[in-house]
Amino acid sequence: MSEQAVEVSPKCLGPQHHINPLRFVMPPGSWDTHFHVFGPTTKYPYSETRKYTPPDSPFEEYVKLMLALGIERGVCVHPNIHGPDNSVTLDAVERSEGRFLAIVKIAPDVTLPQLKEMKKKGACGVRFAFNPEHGSGELDTALFDRVVQWCGELDWCVNLHFASNAIHSLAERLSQLTIPTLIDHFGRVHPTKGVDQPDFKTLVDLMRLPHMWVKLTGADRISRNSPSYQDVVPLARTLVDVAPDRVIWGTDWPHSGYFDVKRMPNDGDLTNLLLDFAPSEEQRRRILVDNPSRLFGQVAKGA
């Protein structure tokens, strides 16, 4: 890791260690479909092109969160700060004793044999994160089209993270896919603009297609009502109504990219939002257990 990289990438905060009490009990077999593992950097150095530098949030710390929340299975999403070297994520999967799967980040010159090797280690999909916070803001369509074809051969999903207004240029391409297609963080739509805004209406239209999935994650990243996040509730309920069998949930731990301690979310508060997003136990069971189990298959063993 170069001194220059450390200088140009500001240090952000780590997650809160205190977890506010849950107001409901997670159903048996619950999944966290979106979390990251960072470091330790002595073993897994950060990419020199990262946009910020978080503290270590290693495998052991995430397992503590799992146990505290009552999560049994998980999908470890490879973070941009580690670049296209997926070692930290795949090692977490290996250490999980069958509880985790991985969604990986790829280099532009990735090959199908490389993806096949990652599948053997527990990878189940590829993530394209090109929102301005992490990338160029534009999708590499040539790479995307090539990798999506390989994902089909591997029975993988494809995962996208983009700025809300990018959905209009992406909609036609995404609508034509035939593999499970996951959209992160409510599509990053702005909740203060309501459910009738063009960005959200386009997301809802996509969610009517049988291969499209959305993650009810990162409410803190789009909300203007911290720490209650109630402005996100109408978006969540709309998505649950439109596609009750294709919405999933995740913690987004360890909540990287925050520099203001007042904005750092509490994992208990974020998890309790499920009571507002999905008021009935049946809805929550679908989101936490049935939907992710069907999407990711019966690969991960119970805790």
Swiss-Prot record:
Keywords assigned by UniProt, alphabetized: Hydrolase
EC top class, as a word: hydrolase
Activity regulation: Completely inhibited by ZnCl(2) and CuCl(2).
Pfam families in alphabetical order: Amidohydro_2
Highest taxon, organism lineage: Bacteria
EC number: 3.1.1.92
Names of required cofactors: Zn(2+)
Database matches in InterPro entries: Amidohydro-rel, Aro_Compnd_Degr_Hydrolases, Metal_Hydrolase, SML-Hydrolase
Biophysicochemical property: pH dependence: Optimum pH is between 7 and 7.5. Approximately 30% of the maximal activities are still detected at pH 5 and pH 9.
MF terms in GO: 4-sulfomuconolactone hydrolase activity
Catalytic activity, reaction form: 4-sulfomuconolactone + H2O = maleylacetate + sulfite + 2 H(+)
SUPFAM superfamilies on file: Metallo-dependent hydrolases
Function in brief: Involved in the degradation of 4-sulfocatechol which is a central intermediate in the degradation of substituted sulfonated benzenes. Catalyzes the hydrolytical desulfonation of 4-sulfomuconolactone to yield maleylacetate.
Complex formation: Monomer.
Family: Belongs to the metallo-dependent hydrolases superfamily. Sulfomuconolactone hydrolase family.
Name by which UniProt lists this protein: 4-sulfomuconolactone hydrolase
Native source species: Hydrogenophaga intermedia
